[in-house]
């Protein structure tokens, strides 16, 4: 979360989160292993300043983006916030109804003040984060297309070995020894929320349909999320 929440801590703090040069030397020279580090934060894609901060500090970075059906992403996000104690509204429907009221002014303040950290923008942006096309355009204005690997989350989790192989090839790391069985890969956050109300899902299919169409046209890929 350095490039979104903890940027004010400075580059020294960020570097301290990674293995030291001594550890790298030991891995490469003594253990004869390739050494590469990375990090992940879903909020980076949505945060208005994360792209340009990363472009400034890591202009050659390779970017792996996982995109999930925005309806399922929003629903999962809501229950994640409930479980984490951040969300107090009792239903998903109430939360998405209140979203713009909660985060609208927060977004404005973020755009006015680069150093502002918004709790609401981070935790309650259920539908807004699913408008992927607008977010990707910001990133792709700063980085060339060849620095991105964009994967469909549903495909990645259905066949993690194949997905991981794509990632390793993208970052030029050998993929020898990868296990083919899905069961070999640990899954986190496996608790499934209750089934979404059918009327709510229908409404969100209609809401996201134009944004998904723009995304498909922009990337030249149809993810089949309109259901």
Report the location of each language-model feature:
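Acidic-and-aromatic substrate-binding clefts and catalytic sites of carbohydrate-active enzymes
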Residues: 3-11, 44-48, 127, 155-159
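ATP-dependent NMP and nucleoside kinases share a basic, alpha-helical "lid"
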Residues: 47-65, 133, 137-140
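PAPS-dependent sulfotransferase catalytic core
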Residues: 1-42, 57, 61, 66, ...
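The conserved 3'-phosphoadenosine-5'-phosphosulfate
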Residues: 137-214, 220-227
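Short, glycine/charged-enriched secondary-structure capping and boundary segments
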Residues: 51-54, 78-82, 164-166
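Structural motif corresponding to alpha-helix initiation and N-cap regions
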Residues: 8-11, 48, 133, 198-201, ...
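Surface-exposed cleft-lining segments at the edges of enzyme active sites
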Residues: 41-42, 112-128, 188-200
């Amino acid at each position: 979360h350095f490039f979104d929440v903890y940027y004010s801590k400075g580059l020294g703090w960020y570097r301290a989160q990674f293995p030291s040069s001594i550890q790298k030397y030991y891995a490469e020279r003594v253990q004869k292993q390739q050494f590469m580090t990375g990090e992940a934060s879903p909020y980076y894609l949505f945060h208005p300043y994360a792209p340009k901060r990363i472009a400034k500090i890591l202009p050659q970075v390779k970017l792996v983006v996982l995109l999930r059906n925005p309806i399922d992403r929003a629903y999962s996000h809501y229950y994640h916030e409930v479980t984490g104690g951040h969300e107090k509204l009792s239903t998903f429907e109430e939360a998405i109804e209140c979203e713009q009221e909660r985060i609208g002014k927060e977004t404005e303040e973020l755009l006015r003040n680069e150093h502002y950290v918004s709790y609401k923008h981070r935790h309650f942006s259920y539908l807004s984060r699913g408008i992927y096309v607008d977010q990707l355009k910001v990133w792709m204005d700063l980085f060339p297309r060849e620095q991105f690997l964009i994967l469909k989350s549903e495909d990645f989790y259905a066949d993690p070995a194949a997905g991981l192989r794509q990632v390793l090839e993208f970052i030029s790391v050998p993929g020898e020894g990868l296990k083919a069985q899905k069961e070999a890969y640990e899954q986190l956050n496996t608790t499934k929320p209750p089934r979404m109300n059918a009327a709510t899902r229908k409404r969100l299919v209609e809401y996201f349909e134009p944004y998904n169409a723009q995304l498909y046209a922009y990337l030249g890929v149809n993810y089949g999320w309109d259901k």
